[in-house]
Amino acid sequence: MERRAALKGLATAIGGLVVLPSWASNWNHTTLQPTDLLSAEETPLLASVVDTIIPKTDTPGAKELGVDRFIQLMIKDCYDSKAQETLKKGLATVEEDSKETFGKSFTACNAAQRIHILEGMGLSDDATSKGFFTMVKGLTIQGYMSSEYVMTNITKYEMIPARWNGCVPVNQ
């Protein structure tokens, strides 16, 4: 190795170690951008939709397992801007339909009223409504089935799938 390249690399590393703590010390929750895709009004609405799709029974529901946060994260990080707009428009449609049909917010409706609204969206001829319902339902199932609670307590997740237990004893 050349001495000049080694000294240059060493100087860069030392400079980085000196500057990094002062740069990172200014980070806090107010200076970082919010990671949520939805607004403060839309987040509980999505949680209610998710809770309607997989409600709490003798096992925790989708809302309790944080599936609404999973959906936001997936759509924000893995889907395109069209899907993000579909989610926002779909939530607005859910709220509008609820107010038109029952005269109250979707989050204030009982379980039967919520199911009625979501079934109507699933059977709708409107591509945006149907696309929203299909996307949210699929992500709800995916998030619920891949949650820690379901994987460990319901489906009995095995770290080594299809392990082979021989029928002949092995002698050492």
Give residue spans per PLM region.
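Mature-region segments of soluble proteins
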Residues: 44-48, 66-172
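Post-signal-peptide N-terminal segment of Sec-exported extracytoplasmic proteins
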Residues: 49-64
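A ubiquitous short alpha-helical element
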Residues: 32-37, 54-55, 78-87
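Sec-dependent signal peptide hydrophobic core
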Residues: 10-15
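C-terminal segment of N-terminal export signals and the immediately downstream linker at the start
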Residues: 1, 5, 18-53
